[in-house]
């Protein structure tokens, strides 16, 4: 959820979570065929304070069109959705440039279908929902602060009463409604691999990948050595199975083995689990209902994307130890425990709860 900060990495360029789901599985009244992508950054943002997106970074969704749901991810993007931000104006709004890289061409859009600039939503303002024309389709784009929907009992290590990381904090979110037809681009693909990245200026006029995130608790939970985590963040998923990435995989397997033995039993094949989780992408089969633990393919990889209320930590820990595991927290929390519980999700796009 949060792999920490270093001198050159502030929270504005720190990825926290990726969500990918069919919109009709979040809102039964939504149009059939639309997907929602959510990229959250800026973890541990305190309440009632305006945070901004970096003006020197590129925030990106990478998408692969997958022909066979049981195949190993290629980690090669067929489509990239890229977002760049200007400095805020006197109303606290940042203008966005939305770039689509697809089919060998690149198109940048800075205005909505009505001709206005693509704008973020300042704190304590009504949501700005930008309809952005790209490649013959319309994307709906929201960018701004929302409550962090993540929940995990990390505090249980330090005190008896269970708490839920994320409660009371905000994140900067980029949430996009994307028509499936736009992602298919004539291929007929119904399955997609998605991952998010942040790139920063490289000092010589270009950008370099700085952060990467897809499935929860992979690079933040399995890769513990700072140097290896930094290396993992800078490579494409297509290199996850390469010889150069072998030290990262070895550390992930060692961590898996350690977690597996917490109950004193060797329950799972750590190498098989690592194979199911790497390359690290979020796969979604759009022919079935969304949900992080709703389905796996023949390789044991999760293929249901991720909904906002999915208990991803319980699902992930269960896979790692070979049996159901619960951390006793949920999005809604336990009645009477003020350390748990989030605001209700919004009924309409972008769905995340209003900021604290």
Give the ranges of each region predicted by the language model.
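Surface-exposed extracytoplasmic segments
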Residues: 1-356
């Amino acid at each position: 959820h949060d792999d920490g900060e270093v001198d050159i990495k502030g929270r504005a360029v720190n990825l926290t979570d990726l969500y990918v789901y069919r919109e009709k599985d979040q809102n039964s009244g939504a149009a059939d065929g639309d997907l929602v992508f959510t990229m959250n950054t800026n973890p541990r943002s305190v309440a009632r304070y305006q945070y901004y997106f970096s003006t020197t970074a590129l925030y990106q969704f990478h998408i692969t069109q997958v022909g066979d749901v049981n195949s190993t991810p290629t980690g090669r993007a067929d489509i990239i959705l890229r977002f760049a931000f200007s400095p805020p104006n006197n109303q606290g709004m940042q203008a966005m440039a939305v770039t689509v890289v697809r089919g060998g061409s690149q198109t940048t859009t800075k205005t909505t279908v009505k001709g206005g600039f693509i704008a973020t939503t300042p704190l304590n303002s009504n949501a700005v929902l930008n309809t952005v024309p790209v490649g013959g389709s319309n994307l709906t784009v929201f960018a701004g602060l929302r409550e962090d929907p993540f929940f995990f009992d990390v505090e249980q290590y330090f005190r008896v009463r269970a708490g839920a990381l994320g409660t009371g904090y905000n994140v900067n979110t980029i949430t996009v409604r994307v028509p499936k037809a736009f992602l298919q681009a004539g291929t007929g693909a119904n399955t997609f691999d998605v991952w998010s990245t942040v790139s920063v200026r490289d000092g010589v006029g270009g950008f370099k990948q700085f952060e990467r995130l897809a499935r929860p608790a992979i690079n933040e939970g399995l890769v513990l050595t700072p140097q290896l985590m930094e290396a993992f963040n800078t490579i494409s998923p297509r290199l996850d199975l390469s010889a150069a990435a072998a030290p990262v995989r070895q550390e992930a397997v060692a961590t898996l083995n350690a977690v597996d033995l917490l109950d004193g039993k060797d329950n799972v094949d750590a190498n098989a689990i690592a194979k199911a989780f790497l390359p690290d992408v979020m796969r979604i089969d759009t022919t079935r209902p969304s949900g992080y633990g709703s389905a796996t393919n023949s390789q044991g990889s999760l293929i249901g994307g991720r909904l906002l209320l999915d208990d991803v930590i319980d699902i992930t820990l269960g896979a790692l130890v070979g049996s159901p595991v619960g951390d006793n927290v949920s999005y809604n929390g336990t009645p009477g425990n003020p350390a748990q519980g989030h605001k209700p999700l919004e009924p309409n796009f972008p769905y995340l709860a209003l900021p604290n």
